């Protein structure tokens, strides 16, 4: 989902750049691409989970995985070395196509890239969940992953700390802040809530 949002944003930037440079055919082409990628109905159809009120990635997912040490085999024999592997637990559920149930920065990309319709209930829900301290809100900015996520503060691998699984990133907070400013000026039922949230963040 984040890639779709970045591509929509990138196409808008290219369209604006081409227009400034007086390259009308390119501006028209990228405007068309941006409109296609920014289609709010398509975004909602693909990524909005009505039950949670969140935008979510879609893919093959299971919660039944973990990191496990295994002895490395060398020339068919166990060695003294071990490696950490991501494994599915025995008897655990196979990955299935579904919305990935982890609320974090990825969930905010439609908001950050200003793809959510200012009049939509989805925007109101994003604003409500954004300020929930059990999810992302802290006194120091928005954390990268909800505290309720099973992956919160969990290592990716032995040497890969959970940078995107709890930490507060100023660049992402800036994108959210800029989006809140945008929605705080846009006509719609959530204008005042977005402006208040902008001031708090």
Give, region by region, the residue ranges found by the protein language model.
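Substrate-binding cleft of carbohydrate-active enzyme catalytic domains
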Residues: 2, 111, 190
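Aromatic- and histidine-enriched alpha-helix N-cap/loop-to-helix transition segments
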Residues: 1-9, 101-105, 164-178
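C-terminal structured "cap/appendage" subdomains that terminate the fold
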Residues: 187-201
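Short intrinsically disordered, low-complexity coil segments enriched in acidic
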Residues: 1-7, 126-130, 200
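Short helix-adjacent coil turns
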Residues: 21-25, 184-185, 189
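C-terminal substrate/ligand-recognition segments
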Residues: 110-186
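Catalytic cores of carbohydrate-active enzymes
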Residues: 8-118, 198-201
């Amino acid at each position: 989902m984040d890639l779709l949002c970045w591509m929509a944003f990138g196409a808008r930037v290219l369209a604006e750049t081409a227009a400034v440079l007086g390259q009308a055919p390119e501006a028209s082409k990228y405007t068309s691409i941006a409109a296609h990628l920014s289609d709010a109905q398509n975004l909602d159809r693909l990524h909005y989970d009505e039950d949670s009120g969140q935008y979510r990635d879609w893919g093959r997912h299971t919660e039944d995985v973990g990191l496990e040490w295994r002895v490395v085999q060398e020339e068919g024999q166990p060695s003294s070395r071990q490696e950490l592997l991501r494994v599915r637990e025995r008897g655990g559920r196979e990955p299935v196509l579904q919305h990935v149930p982890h609320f974090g920065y990825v969930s905010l990309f439609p908001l950050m890239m200003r793809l959510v319709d200012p009049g939509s209930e989805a925007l109101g829900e994003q604003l409500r969940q954004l300020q929930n301290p059990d999810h992302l809100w802290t006194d120091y900015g928005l954390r990268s992953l909800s505290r309720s996520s099973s992956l919160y503060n969990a290592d990716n691998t032995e040497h890969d700390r959970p940078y995107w699984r709890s930490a507060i990133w100023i660049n992402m907070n800036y994108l959210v802040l800029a989006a809140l400013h945008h929605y705080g000026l846009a006509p719609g039922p959530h204008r005042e809530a977005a402006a208040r949230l902008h001031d708090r963040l």
